[in-house]
Design a protein with these regions (language model features):
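Contiguous, well-ordered beta-strand patches that form the walls/edges
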Residues: 53-55, 78-128
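Small disulfide-bonded, cysteine-rich extracellular recognition modules and tandem repeats
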Residues: 15, 50, 72, 151-154
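Short, solvent-exposed loop/hinge segments that bridge or flank secondary-structure elements
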Residues: 30-82, 141
Length: 155
């Protein structure tokens, strides 16, 4: 009898009784996906890469990143409109998405809500220098602020 009562109560709660509005779909709690203010084609290309922990080291790190252009990190164009990059601690790059957020921040990461643990936040981007930081605290500590300096003018 208790199982029958539980089943009936479960059914009633999904029907929206005593309400003039229909019940929300199960995933309605997720915020709608927002587009990033940076387009994938803006970051595709060859980049010198270095990182820093101390903000005072940023100018020196940009110079070091530029020096890495002889062995550039390549951000590729994905087949589904994203970019091909590495996730933290992954040897194989994969297609990631650029995602916007209600707070105005941009992220790069796998499909899912912006600012998820596997994402990296785009701290700044001016077309020539891209700075990212992993959302995951452990990855952020290990990798620091990643500085990408464009190696050559875009085609």
């Amino acid at each position: 009898m208790i199982s029958t009562l539980a089943a009936l109560l479960g059914a009633c709660s999904g029907m929206g009784l005593m309400s003039s509005t229909p019940s929300a779909p199960p995933d309605a709690g997720m915020a709608p996906e927002m587009p990033a203010t940076i387009r994938p084609d803006e970051i595709v290309g060859k980049w010198g890469l270095a990182s820093y922990q101390n903000p005072a080291d940023r100018p020196r790190t940009e110079v070091q990143a530029k020096a890495q252009c002889k062995q550039p990190y390549v951000i590729g164009a994905g087949t589904s409109g994203g970019v091909v990059m590495h996730l933290a601690d992954q040897a194989t790059p994969e297609e990631l998405r650029l995602k916007g957020s209600q707070g105005g921040k941009n992220y790069i990461g796998p499909p899912g809500p912006a600012g998820s643990e596997q994402d990296r936040e785009i701290v700044s981007f001016d077309g020539r220098v891209l700075i990212t930081r992993f959302v995951d605290k452990d990855a952020a500590t290990r990798y620091g602020n990643m500085v990408y300096v464009r190696c050559a003018p875009r085609a």
